[in-house]
Amino acid sequence: MNQSKLDLLREALPYIQKFKGKTFVVKFSGKVTEDRENLLSLTEELALLHQVGIRLCVIHGGGKQLTQLADQLGVAQTVIEGRRVTDDDTLELAKMIFAGKINTDILAALRNRGIEAVGLSGIDGDVVKAVRRPPKEITNRQTGATETVDFGHVGDVVEINARLLNLLLENDYLPVISSLGADDEGR
C-alpha cells in the first residue's frame, strides 16, 4: 500500500470508528439519476460508507423527471413561486416516476456496487406519515400581490415510523425511499 493511501486511511479511521453503527439520512434530488456517471459516483461513495458499517437511509425526489413526464403526456402543470401544485393527475405521475423509475435506477446503481438495497416509498410500511398542507398565503414576487394557494396533494411530514427502516438496517440492507407519504386515511 502506498504512503498516500495509508495516510488517507489514518485520517479516515477516527471518523469510521466514531460513526460506525450510526444512522445517517442522505437526501438527494432525482436529478442525480439523470446522468449515469454521476449516479455511479454517488453510489460508490454510499457503498463505501455502508461497507465500513455506517448505516444509511437514502431519500430521493424527482421533480424534474415528473415535469418531463407530465410534458410528454400532455398533463398541464401549475407552478406558483417555484412550488408545484399537485393535482390528481400529477400525483399519479409522481407515483410512477418516484416509486418506479427513479427508485429502480438508484437500486440498480447500488447493486452495481455490491450493496443490497430495498426500494420503498414513504407509504410502504407506514414509514412516512404526512398531512395535506393547508392553503398558504403566497406573495407574488413580481407584483407584490398576496394570494391564498392550495397546493393540492402536497403534504407535510408529521411522523417517521422507523420500525421497518430499523429492521432493514439491522439486517444490512440500505433503504432507498421515494418522497411519497400518506395520511391516516391513505391519501
Please annotate each region the language model reported:
Residues 1-187:
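Nucleotide/pyrophosphate-binding catalytic subdomain
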